[in-house]
Amino acid sequence: MSKAGTWIKMFVVGTVICVGGPALVQAIRPTDEELFKRYNPELQRRSLEEGDRRAQEFDDYVNKLKQWSKSDKSIWVAAQEQQEQMRTQAAVQRSQAKDEAKAQREEMRKELLGEK
């Protein structure tokens, strides 16, 4: 066979592989609806219940990414700063709750002892 024939044959084989492979995968891959129908009823129910919550969490995450990307800093640095801010706020809230509980206990103790 001539060199031109070999080149043509290799071009045809390459095209079949490059086009046929993804086409085959697309043809045999089940759709989301087909996969959902294969679930047992309990998984279907749980998936339907949690679907909205997961979609909302994903939307929140995407919005956070958009917010972080507007910053001059790297997304990872901005995310880390926000996590640190959240930790600080949580620590402040815990300390406030602890102080309120302590004040409430002190007030209850005073009421029990009749000091009020």
Swiss-Prot record:
Alphabetically ordered keywords of this record: Chaperone, Coiled coil, Membrane, Mitochondrion, Mitochondrion inner membrane, Transmembrane, Transmembrane helix
Major subcellular site: mitochondrion
Transmembrane regions: 7-29
Stretches with biased composition (Basic and acidic residues): 96-116
Membrane disposition: Single-pass membrane protein
Domain of life of the source: Eukaryota
GO CC terms in record: mitochondrial inner membrane
PANTHER family membership: ASSEMBLY FACTOR CBP4
Family assignment from sequence similarity: Belongs to the CBP4 family.
Role of this protein: Essential for the assembly of ubiquinol-cytochrome c reductase. It has a direct effect on the correct occurrence of the Rieske protein, core 4, core 5 and apocytochrome b.
Protein name: Assembly factor cbp4
Gene that encodes the chain: cbp4
